[in-house]
Amino acid sequence: MLVVAFKPGHDGAVAAIDDRRLLYSLESEKDSRPRYSTLLPTTFLDIAERLGAIPDVVALGGWADLRPRGVVYTGAGYEGTQEPTVTTSRFFGKEVKFFTSTHERSHIYMALGMAPKDGAPLKSVLVWEGDVGAFYLVDSEHRIIRTIPVMTGPGARYSFLFGLADPTFPDTGGKPRLNDAGKLMALAAFGDSADASPDIRHVVERVLKQDSMYPAPKAEYRDSVLHNAGVESEECKIAAALLTERLFETFAEVARRELPEGTPLYISGGCGLNCDWNSQWAQLGHFSSVFVAPCTNDSGSALGTAIDALTTFTGDPHIDWNVYSGLEFVHDTRPDPARWESVPLDHAALSSALAAGRVVAWVQGRWEIGPRALGNRSLLAEAFSSASRDRLNTVKMREDYRPIAPVCRVEDLGKVFHEDFEDPHMLYFRRVREESGVRAVTHVDGSARCQTVTGTSNPELHRLLSVFAQGQGLGVLCNTSLNFNGDGFINRMSDLVRYCEWREIQDMVVGDTWYRRIAGS
């Protein structure tokens, strides 16, 4: 059975599953298009070019848009766990099954289908994102048997706090910005909730109790200590730490009270990208295990709708998937030989260049699904000098308070970090060993969000890390996404060359070819 699913609204995407195997999950923002792009015709054409047959099932995820005349719904709409709609339709002349289910269900089934099989009679699912904040109990037949609402819009509340302190965010008519949550997560590490004044605590509790964040009610907070205080102010950092703590406490309290102890927990929604919260869920002790997918936010919603359709028709959500299920790199031009020399990739020589402080644009195979660079569309740099962090933030045109993530081969985890668990998709925090000296990837609170690499999960990157370890003692590097500021991953040679020449990057590796900028060119 070939299922193709489409995700409307922001983070537009299309996913294809054939006989339970994920073929592609394509996000429209990737290939240097604006972050959070809606589904583009080019993305539809990309999937159509690569599929060998017309699908048996065409699935449309639900969505809702707030317009001046009211809410406009797409497909099954945004909220709810009601049964999907299945009809017969036609798709390019072929009779197909047409399927649509809510956006909320896409998150639930994305988590269920991507998680390892578990024979537990009950499973707990958490969806927390911009609009939905709830737990669900799922039975052994993969049916949702109970919904436990906790809080509407946890992600929107989290993002709103950043906008509240940001003088550039409007007092009226604004919506919580999709990219502010990650910035607030970075700022929270600079603050201590114990330092919160009564005024800050009052604001945070107001945010938690606010009826709605759409539109963002900033004008109602004009009298607060956080209104336009500046995102790097001490007040904002302390409030960020406190809100991070209070949001987790609110959901954890409900989990302990309402969910059976010992069930596996599957986390979905944009808040699943918060590594602090993921670590706390894993340490809570209430669940037998915790699973978070690399595309836990809306980048995985099309895939979730496809899995929901698969479950409806077969009774089983589980799929065979690989995180590198995007498109191959496009060789649409050749770097100018007057400016770039090309040589076969020499891992030892490249490791020496990295150790000397060079930043390397690193491209391998198909792009990663989800928002995080996992070693196929990455900027790499040595991790021992804090200058690497500053250089990478300058290259990426990011705020200097933003941390840089490490990538580490599994053989060196215990030497670099206090916790040596594997995390191939960079979803949990761990504590850095000070004696490891990896200053570029150590956040202000001593934590890091590390991608772990084995010889099978990403062989080419593991080989580079192993050669680097031979010379430097540890197989660890800085790893951040290869993209223009505000765009998705770079995925074609013309954009890669333009980016590297603009941002003064001297080294590009594409597959097994190393392009080196010629001095003075």
Swiss-Prot record:
CDD domains: ASKHA_NBD_CmcH_N. GO terms for molecular function: transferase activity. GO terms for biological process: antibiotic biosynthetic process. Pathway: Antibiotic biosynthesis; cephamycin C biosynthesis. The keyword Ligase does not apply. Keywords: Antibiotic biosynthesis, Transferase. The keyword Transferase applies. InterPro entries: Carbam_trans_C, Carbam_trans_C_sf, Carbtransf_dom, NodU/CmcH_Carbamoyltrnsfr. PANTHER family: NODULATION PROTEIN U. This is 3'-hydroxymethylcephem-O-carbamoyltransferase. It comes from Streptomyces clavuligerus. The lineage of its organism: Bacteria, Bacillati, Actinomycetota, Actinomycetes, Kitasatosporales. The gene is cmcH.
